[in-house]
């Protein structure tokens, strides 16, 4: 009798499952989503050059010192042509302010054209040949670096003159050798030194010039830069 009542009461029991078990079963029964998931990062189409620059035209001014007026006048067409035809910019020489003014226009499509043209004109004003400065327009990995002899070593009077003479060499031989080995262009303007080239080549030329200023003999400097240049060539 007691066993029958226990059996009857046992039929009314319900099994209780935990919350974790219910979640796991629901996840197993749910079909696996193998479709392409939408990316969380926004995907915007590239903006064209004219929209990026906006309606307002940008302008840069490059000051021209008095000793560069004549070279600028003689080489004006060589400077004017690539800026207008290749970079699609407007350029003029303001006689009142003595500045070369470069301006964007409706035809300008390249966002970096204004910077390239400014670097090109600035390189010519510093003393580089038009053909050498034009490389700044054609190539993207070229830079200009300027420093003074006194930045390396505080020299004065005859000591400063001798340091500049060591950099130039007899008939410009030392300067030409550094240019050829490091594939750079160097301008010596009084105590200022301007180097045009790629980042790695500028570094090699700058190291050689600094060693000459600090008093190293040219023969030792030649050997060092040739060794560095050959290692760089083997690396690439």
From Swiss-Prot:
Residues 152-209 form the KH domain. GO terms for molecular function: RNA binding. GO terms for cellular component: nucleolus; small-subunit processome. Residues 26-43 have a biased composition (Basic and acidic residues). Pfam families: KH_KRR1_1st, KH_PNO1_2nd. Keywords: Nucleus, RNA-binding. Gene3D superfamilies: K Homology domain, type 1. The keyword Nucleus applies. It comes from the Eukaryota. GO terms for biological process: ribosomal small subunit biogenesis. Its main location: nucleus. Residues 1-59 are annotated as: Disordered. It is found in: Nucleus, Nucleolus. Transmembrane segments: none annotated. Part of the small subunit (SSU) processome, composed of more than 70 proteins and the RNA chaperone small nucleolar RNA (snoRNA) U3. Belongs to the PNO1 family. Part of the small subunit (SSU) processome, first precursor of the small eukaryotic ribosomal subunit. During the assembly of the SSU processome in the nucleolus, many ribosome biogenesis factors, an RNA chaperone and ribosomal proteins associate with the nascent pre-rRNA and work in concert to generate RNA folding, modifications, rearrangements and cleavage as well as targeted degradation of pre-ribosomal RNA by the RNA exosome. Positively regulates dimethylation of two adjacent adenosines in the loop of a conserved hairpin near the 3'-end of 18S rRNA. This is RNA-binding protein PNO1. The lineage of its organism: Eukaryota, Metazoa, Chordata, Craniata, Vertebrata. The gene is pno1.
């Amino acid at each position: 009798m007691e066993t029958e009542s226990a059996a009857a009461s046992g039929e009314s029991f319900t099994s209780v499952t935990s919350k974790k078990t219910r979640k796991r079963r629901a996840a197993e029964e749910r079909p696996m989503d193998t479709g392409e998931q939408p990316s969380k990062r926004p995907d915007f189409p590239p903006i064209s050059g004219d929209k990026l620059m906006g309606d307002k035209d940008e302008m840069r001014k490059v000051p021209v010192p008095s000793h560069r007026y004549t070279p600028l006048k003689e080489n004006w067409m060589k400077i004017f042509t690539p800026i207008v035809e290749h970079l699609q910019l407007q350029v003029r020489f303001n006689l009142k302010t003595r500045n070369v003014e470069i301006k964007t226009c409706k035809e300008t499509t390249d966002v970096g054209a204004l910077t390239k043209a400014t670097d090109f004109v600035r390189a010519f004003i510093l003393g580089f040949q038009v053909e050498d400065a034009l490389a700044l327009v054609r190539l993207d990995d070229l830079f200009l670096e300027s420093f003074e002899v006194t930045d390396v070593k505080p020299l004065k009077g005859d000591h400063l003159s001798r340091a500049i003479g060591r950099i130039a060499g007899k008939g410009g031989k030392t300067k030409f050798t550094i240019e050829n080995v490091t594939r750079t262009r160097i301008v010596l303007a009084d105590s200022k030194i301007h180097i045009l080239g790629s980042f790695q080549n500028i570094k090699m030329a700058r190291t050689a010039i600094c060693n000459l200023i600090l008093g190293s003999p040219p023969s030792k400097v030649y050997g060092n830069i040739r060794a560095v240049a050959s290692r760089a060539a083997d690396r690439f």
